[in-house]
């Protein structure tokens, strides 16, 4: 199935409105837009370099307004009643947005309301897009009754005999097994999250960076190791995880527990070298992922991914606290972005490994609610993530680099998610999964560069 013309038009309108959200939220660009003191003509000093930016902003707003009108007109004959409602809301709100923009340009203190209305238009269009994609590509694939999930394994299977290895080869294999326990693939992104939290808070010292990121790597390693221990029986049932070191008896459980405990203690020592709050948050992150997520959320509720997003959000607070010793609004909003991004990211993997998760006994969204509902929720959480990224610009001093990166990366992520609805294959799910990784990675790098360049 290929993307239809209206889906493409609606997606383009969503991106266009998001451009206005990010521009309105980014302080440097919003100040430039204020260089025009007249409306509808600019009336600014042409020698002021901010004037071209302001004129461009108004031009983009005019084009986006035409897109909103065109989307409403085309959609009125091509989509469902509830999607028409969202289009009507956007069409009604856009003139109010224009009036607010005129008042802001002529000196009225309504900039926050102007931004809020832009966010509201974006939100209703995202909901409309999710509903339209559901109606056009979805099916009634939700199970009529909860699926029969696999029961837990009661007995530890016997260890399989390992091939004989030389001393050096055995040492390398053992080191590789312990390294795999730490879930190293998670480290780069979570370190970027902590790094972004630090630079949003201020300019960290080299010592703070080293101990915070070092503590973070050790905390991730401890959490990953405990997760391997606690899920070893389930890992053996799942094709994706059946070759993990503890599941294959390559690492004994007792040794893994000792290794995880050592990493946790080292992590807390590193965080304590920064400050007490960073250490408390680091301990909370280890406990949340290892106990709350692994033992309580993941095997028992379909909302495991959503609530579990708190584990990925905590590094943002750790980074912020490492610099200031407190938790501020910038750190909280960054943490919210990560929290909202997590379902939009992980639901793609849940789609690709749906059968494996069902075999493992995990009530993931595709297993319990079906693939159609899961794809719709990816759109919802993607929209919420983008709004969070816009809010982050509003509460920080991030500039044009962040704004441009956020918009371009969002466009690619949205394209991958829309394509997922029409292609509905494992390949499309992985493409959307990688697009989500790229989105967050690029946005975090932009935060680092933009903040440090100021």
Swiss-Prot record:
CDD domains: PT_UbiA_Cox10
Transmembrane segments: 9-29, 59-79, 87-107, 113-133, 186-206, 209-229, 251-271, 276-296, 300-320, 321-341, 377-397, 398-418, 433-453
Major location category of this protein: membrane
Location in the cell: Cell membrane
Annotated Pfam families: UbiA
UniProt keyword list: Cell membrane, Heme biosynthesis, Membrane, Transferase, Transmembrane, Transmembrane helix
Region (Unknown): 1-186
Reactions it catalyzes: heme b + (2E,6E)-farnesyl diphosphate + H2O = Fe(II)-heme o + diphosphate
Entry similarity comment: In the C-terminal section; belongs to the UbiA prenyltransferase family. Protoheme IX farnesyltransferase subfamily.
Protein known as: Protoheme IX farnesyltransferase 1
Organism: Natronomonas pharaonis (strain ATCC 35678 / DSM 2160 / CIP 103997 / JCM 8858 / NBRC 14720 / NCIMB 2260 / Gabara) (Halobacterium pharaonis)
């Amino acid at each position: 199935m290929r993307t239809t013309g209206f889906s493409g038009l609606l997606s383009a309108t969503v991106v266009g409105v998001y451009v206005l959200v990010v521009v309105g939220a980014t302080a440097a660009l919003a100040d430039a837009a204020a260089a025009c003191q007249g409306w509808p003509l600019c009336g600014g000093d042409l020698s002021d370099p901010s004037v071209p930016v302001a004129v461009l902003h108004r031009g983009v707003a005019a084009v986006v307004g035409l897109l909103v009108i065109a989307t409403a007109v085309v959609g009125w004959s091509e989509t469902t009643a509830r999607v028409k409602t969202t289009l009507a809301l956007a069409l009604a709100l856009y003139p109010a947005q224009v009036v607010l923009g005129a008042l802001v340009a002529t000196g009225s203190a309504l900039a926050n309301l102007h931004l809020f209305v832009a966010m509201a238009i974006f939100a209703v269009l995202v909901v409309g897009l999710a509903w339209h994609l559901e109606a056009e590509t979805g099916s009634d694939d939700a199970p009529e009754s909860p699926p029969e999930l696999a029961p837990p394994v009661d007995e530890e299977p016997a260890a399989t005999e390992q091939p004989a290895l030389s001393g050096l080869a055995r040492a390398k294999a053992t080191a590789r097994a312990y390294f795999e326990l730490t879930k190293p693939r998670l480290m780069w992104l979570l370190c970027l999250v902590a790094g972004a939290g630090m630079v949003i808070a201020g300019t960290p010292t080299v010592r703070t960076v080293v101990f915070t990121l070092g503590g973070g790597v050790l905390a991730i390693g401890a959490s990953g190791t405990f997760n391997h221990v606690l899920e070893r029986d389930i890992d053996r049932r799942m094709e994706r995880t059946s070759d993990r070191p503890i599941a294959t008896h390559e690492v004994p459980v007792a040794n893994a527990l000792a290794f995880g405990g050592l990493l946790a203690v080292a992590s807390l020592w590193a965080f304590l070298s920064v400050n007490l709050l960073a250490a408390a948050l680091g301990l909370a992150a280890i406990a949340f992922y290892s106990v709350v997520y692994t033992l309580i959320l993941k095997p028992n509720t379909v909302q495991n991914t959503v609530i579990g997003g708190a584990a990925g959000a905590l590094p943002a607070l750790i980074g912020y606290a490492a610099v200031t010793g407190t938790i501020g609004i910038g750190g909280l909003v960054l943490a919210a972005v990560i929290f909202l991004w997590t379902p939009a990211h992980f639901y793609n993997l849940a789609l690709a490994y749906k059968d494996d998760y069902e075999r493992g006994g995990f009530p993931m969204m595709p297993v319990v609610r079906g693939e159609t509902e899961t794809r719709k929720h990816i759109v919802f959480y993607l929209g919420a993530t983008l709004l969070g990224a816009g809010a982050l610009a509003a509460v920080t001093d991030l500039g044009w680099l962040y704004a441009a990166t956020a918009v371009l990366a969002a466009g690619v992520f949205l394209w991958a998610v829309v394509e997922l609805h029409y292609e509905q294959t494992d390949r499309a799910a992985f493409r959307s999964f990688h697009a989500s990784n790229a989105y967050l990675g690029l946005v975090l790098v932009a935060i680092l560069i933009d903040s440090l360049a100021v």
